[in-house]
């Protein structure tokens, strides 16, 4: 995990504390369960999404911050978020936790052998996790705001 400015515009955020950028999903790569998220799988969900919660380890009652930006790019589902939870912030900054994951409902999928191609998904939440199902779904930048 690198500590760096996320972008000049986003660095001017009024949020204090820890912010990160990373990928909650990576396209066209099988996860540990054999699911493959295809590019465009989140397009409709992002159009109709309200606020998507940022959770700790997929626990419904464990909101640890606020997602500031969600978008699909060529690589996957990009996330920029502010973390307000002190424990999660410490673990993120220390590099002890740096995985990302997402909760979802399948709208459209295709079975391909023992794998599933996820074509359209509803996005329920994004989580900071210790052990992501998609090993490439990681935080790639952390920003510590001055106090």
Name what the model sees in each region.
Residues 1-10, 49-50, 57-71, 85:
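Short small/polar-residue motifs
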Residues 1-13, 17-48, 142-146:
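Polar/acidic, low-complexity leader/linker segments enriched in S/T/G and N/D
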Residues 11, 33, 56, 135-138:
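A generic alpha-helix propensity feature with a strong bias for hydrophobic helices
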Residues 17-21, 29, 53, 66-147:
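Residue microenvironments linked to proteolytic maturation
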Residues 30-39, 54-61, 84:
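Short low-complexity stretches enriched in small and charged residues
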Residues 44, 50-59, 100-101:
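Short conserved beta-strand and strand-loop elements enriched in small hydrophobics
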């Amino acid at each position: 995990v690198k500590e760096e400015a996320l972008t000049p515009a986003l660095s001017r955020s009024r949020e204090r504390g820890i912010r990160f950028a990373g990928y909650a999903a990576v396209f066209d790569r099988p996860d540990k369960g054999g699911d493959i998220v295809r590019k465009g799988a989140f397009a409709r969900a992002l159009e109709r999404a309200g606020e998507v919660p940022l959770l700790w380890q997929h626990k419904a009652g464990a909101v640890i911050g606020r997602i500031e930006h969600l978008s699909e790019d060529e690589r996957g589902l990009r996330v920029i978020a502010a973390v307000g939870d002190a424990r999660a912030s410490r673990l993120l900054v220390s590099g002890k936790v740096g995985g990302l994951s997402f909760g979802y409902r399948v709208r459209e999928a295709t079975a391909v052998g023992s794998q599933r191609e996820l074509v359209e998904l509803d996005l329920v939440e994004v989580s900071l996790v210790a052990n992501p199902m998609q090993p490439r779904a990681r935080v790639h930048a952390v920003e510590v705001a001055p106090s």
